[in-house]
Amino acid sequence: MFFDNCCIERVNLHKHLGVYLSSSLDWRKQIDEVCLKANRKLSVLRSVKLLSRQTLDVLYKLTVRSVIDYALPLYCNTLKQSELSRLENVQYRAAKLVTGAFRFTSREKLNQELGWESIKRRSDNLGLNIFHKIHSYETRPLIRSCMPKPDIENKYNVRSKGGYIPFKHSGLKFKKSFFPT
């Protein structure tokens, strides 16, 4: 492939804006890197575990969760269960650290006690938030221009007047991606 008379090398893995994109459309390398970074930051939090619960909660959200959340809506819906559980395990270890809970404490109880959401639910909410910003013109015009045009010519009395025309796609990966269908 050529661009501006220069040959573009084909690669199997490319890091773009901190996100690893693979030619096979899997996110293994991305999850490996996210877990590695999050675990490093979690180990730093362990050294200050004597701070109050509120302080540890804020530190977790600033350091560890920000690493997990970066680009999460982009790939979360296409993750394998094993990859998603790796992210959930990082959050579970952080919840045990923040609360001082014992080893076999229920993940759901810890999340409920702290007011945290599961990684999957957080991804869905972040994705909805991003889509709302795009839809309500709170993003740059370039991003808004990538969205399909609303179907203005709808003559029927339906709840979704002015809704988006769905993309035509054939793959399961695209169907589960961030983009609305």
Where are the regions a protein language model picked out?
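Hydrophobic/basic alpha-helical segments
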Residues: M1-T181
